[in-house]
Amino acid sequence: MIKSKYLVQQFSNKIKKIIFILFFLTLCSTVFADSKMDLGLEVYSNKAQCGVCHTLQAAGSFGDIGPNLDQMNFQMSQIIYAVTNGIGVMPAYEGILTSEEIEAVSFYVSEKSN
């Protein structure tokens, strides 16, 4: 009986640790996503000035040269490719933006566009 109680207590402690770790990881991922969104908006609005050509209501941009991003449904990988290599009249940002900035602006656009 004592051994059984001990095993239950050990199991309970392990479950508590797992719950704590999951909570911590969830909190970290939320903070990471928020900072990535902030960097993405900064790159979109200021460094790359995407809003000069593109409409994206969430960013307060209403450019009419490139596609209206509010009406697009791109995969993040497609956005990364376009930002990195350019497409049509859109310039390539490889060498202008860091890979972190390219990923952040792509994440931002993929999350904020419809």
Where do the model's predicted regions map?
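C-type cytochrome heme c attachment motif
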Residues: S45-T55, G88-P91, E103-F107
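Extended, non-globular alpha-helical segments
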Residues: M1-N13, V83-V89, Y93-I96, A104
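Gly/Gly-Pro-rich "capping" loops immediately C-terminal to redox-active cysteine motifs
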Residues: L41-E42, G51-I87
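N-terminal export/targeting leaders of redox proteins
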Residues: M1-D34, N114
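Electrostatic cytochrome c docking/interface patches
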Residues: T26-S45, Q78
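Extracytoplasmic copper-binding redox domains, predominantly the cupredoxin/blue-copper superfamily
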Residues: I2, F32, F62-G63, P67, ...
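C-terminal capping alpha-helices of c-type cytochrome domains
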Residues: G95-N114
